[in-house]
C-alpha cells in the first residue's frame, strides 16, 4: 500500500488531528469518529483507526509501519513505546519537530532533495534513524537556507521536546537523547496499534 497523497482534511475528520500530515485541525462537529453508522465502533474499528492515525501522521506505507512494529517487537521493553521511539527518531520527523519543516511530508522533501546534513554529511534517506549527539544542519547554500528559514518563520514556535535543541540562527538542530514517550507529537494509544498487528498474524 502506497503513502497517502489524497485530501488531508478528509483524514483528520475521520481520525482527528494529525499534525505530521497537516497543521489543520477538524472543526467542531466535523469529527466523524463518533458518527459511525452503527452508532458504536467495534473494537476492531478502534484498533484500525489508531493504526491509521500512526501511519498517516508519520507518512508511512503499510509495509513500512509493519516493519517498524516487527523491529519493536524484538526489542527489549514495551513494544508500543519502542515503536513510538523508532518513529519519532526518524530524520524526517526530527526536522518536523525542530520546526525546520511544517509537515513530515515537507521534511521528507527536504531530505530527498539533499538539503539536509547529519554530522556534516548529506543524508537523503528520510527514514534515517537519528541518535543522541547527532547534529542536523542545512547545506551551506542560499536555496537550502531560504527553505528552512521560511519554515522557521512560519513555525508556531511551540515548546521543543526535551530531546531536541534548535539553534535557528545557525540552521542547526541537536539530538540530545532518545525521546521520552510523554514528548511524542501525536495523541495515540500505541497499545491498540500493537494489538491490531498481533491479531493479523
Curated annotation (Swiss-Prot):
Domain annotation S4 RNA-binding: ranges: 89-149
Keyword Mitochondrion on entry: no
Highest taxon above the source species: Eukaryota
Keyword check for rRNA-binding: yes
GO BP term, pick one: ribosomal small subunit biogenesis
InterPro entries referenced in this protein's UniProt entry, alphabetically: Ribosomal_uS4 (IPR022801), Ribosomal_uS4_bac-type (IPR005709), Ribosomal_uS4_CS (IPR018079), Ribosomal_uS4_N (IPR001912), S4_RNA-bd (IPR002942), S4_RNA-bd_sf (IPR036986)
Chain coiled-coil ranges: none
GO MF annotation terms: rRNA binding; structural constituent of ribosome
Pfam families in the cross-refs: Ribosomal_S4, S4
Keywords: Chloroplast, Plastid, Ribonucleoprotein, Ribosomal protein, RNA-binding, rRNA-binding
Primary site of residence: plastid
One cellular component term from this protein's GO annotations in UniProt: small ribosomal subunit
The protein's assembly and partners: Part of the 30S ribosomal subunit. Contacts protein S5. The interaction surface between S4 and S5 is involved in control of translational fidelity.
Protein family (similarity comment): Belongs to the universal ribosomal protein uS4 family.
PANTHER family (alphabetical): 30S 40S RIBOSOMAL PROTEIN, SMALL RIBOSOMAL SUBUNIT PROTEIN US4M
Function field: One of the primary rRNA binding proteins, it binds directly to 16S rRNA where it nucleates assembly of the body of the 30S subunit.
Protein name, as recorded: Small ribosomal subunit protein uS4c
Organism: Nandina domestica
Gene designation: rps4
Amino acid at each position: 500500500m502506497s503513502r497517502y497523497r489524497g485530501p488531508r482534511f478528509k483524514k483528520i475528520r475521520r481520525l482527528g488531528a494529525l499534525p505530521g500530515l497537516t497543521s489543520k485541525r477538524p472543526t467542531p462537529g466535523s469529527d466523524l469518529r463518533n458518527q459511525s453508522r452503527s452508532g458504536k465502533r467495534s473494537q476492531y474499528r478502534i484498533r484500525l483507526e489508531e493504526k491509521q492515525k500512526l501511519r498517516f501522521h508519520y507518512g508511512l506505507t503499510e509495509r513500512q509501519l509493519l516493519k517498524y512494529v516487527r523491529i519493536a517487537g524484538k526489542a527489549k521493553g514495551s513494544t508500543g513505546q519502542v515503536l513510538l521511539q523508532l518513529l519519532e527518531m526518524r530524520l524526517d520527523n526530527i526536522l518536523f519537530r525542530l520546526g525546520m519543516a511544517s509537515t513530515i511530508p515537507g521534511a521528507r522533501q527536504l531530505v530527498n532533495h539533499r538539503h539536509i546534513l547529519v554530522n556534516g554529511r548529506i543524508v537523503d534517506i528520510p527514514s534515517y534513524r537519528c541518535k543522541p549527539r547527532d547534529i542536523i544542519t542545512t547545506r551551506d547554500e542560499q536555496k537550502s537556507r531560504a527553505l528552512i528559514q521560511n519554515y522557521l518563520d512560519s513555525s508556531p514556535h511551540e515548546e521543543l521536546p526535551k530531546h531536541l535543541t534548535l539553534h535557528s540562527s545557525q540552521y542547526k538542530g541537536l539530538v540530545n537523547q532518545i525521546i521520552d514517550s510523554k514528548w511524542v507529537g501525536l495523541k495515540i494509544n500505541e497499545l491498540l496499534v500493537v494489538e491490531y498487528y498481533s491479531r493479523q498474524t
